[in-house]
Amino acid sequence: MSSNLTEEQIAEFKEAFALFDKDNNGSISSSELATVMRSLGLSPSEAEVNDLMNEIDVDGNHQIEFSEFLALMSRQLKSNDSEQELLEAFKVFDKNGDGLISAAELKHVLTSIGEKLTDAEVDDMLREVSDGSGEINIQQFAALLSK
């Protein structure tokens, strides 16, 4: 699972992990997960940490082994890369370069990335994130798709 990580990244993660592995038993408590992630530049919410914990604590011991942590970080970095790719795609479809996508542009973007959404679904998405202008900015779009 961690095959997309460089040796440098693995070493950085191991160092951060070791700082919180106080008794050197190869694991950290679930309550320390958020602190470790923040030390690596991520900013997970409490709910996200709980969700992640439920997913990665595969043996259910409320401890996170380094292998579980590496799998998590690999996935988190991949997610961040996907968000960056999404932002780049957004910019491509922002025809006039004003940082906004209209409903028509959004429909085109969603069709281009393989989504098969109806007009009503796109309208619902716009209503959820728009300030009422019928357009959304890059940050609103990324936030919408990361929910």
From Swiss-Prot:
Name of encoding gene: CMD1
Protein name, UniProt field: Calmodulin
Domain of life: Eukaryota
Record-linked Pfam families: EF-hand_7
Signal peptide stretch: none
Residues the record lists as binding Ca(2+) 3: 94, 96, 98, 105
Family: Belongs to the calmodulin family.
GO biological process per UniProt: cell budding; cellular hyperosmotic response; cytoskeleton organization; endocytosis; karyogamy involved in conjugation with cellular fusion; microautophagy; microtubule cytoskeleton organization; phosphatidylinositol biosynthetic process
Major subcellular location class: cytoplasm
Species in which this protein is naturally found: Saccharomyces cerevisiae (strain ATCC 204508 / S288c) (Baker's yeast)
Subunit-level organization: Component of the SPC110 complex containing at least CMD1, SPC29, SPC42 and SCP110. Interacts with SPC110.
GO molecular function annotation: calcium ion binding; calcium-dependent protein binding; enzyme regulator activity; mitogen-activated protein kinase binding
Phenotype upon changing residue 32 to V: Highly reduced affinity for Ca(2+)
PANTHER family named in the record: CALMODULIN LIKE 3 (PTHR23048:SF0), MYOSIN LIGHT CHAIN 1, 3 (PTHR23048)
Domain EF-hand: 8-43, 44-79, 81-116, 117-147
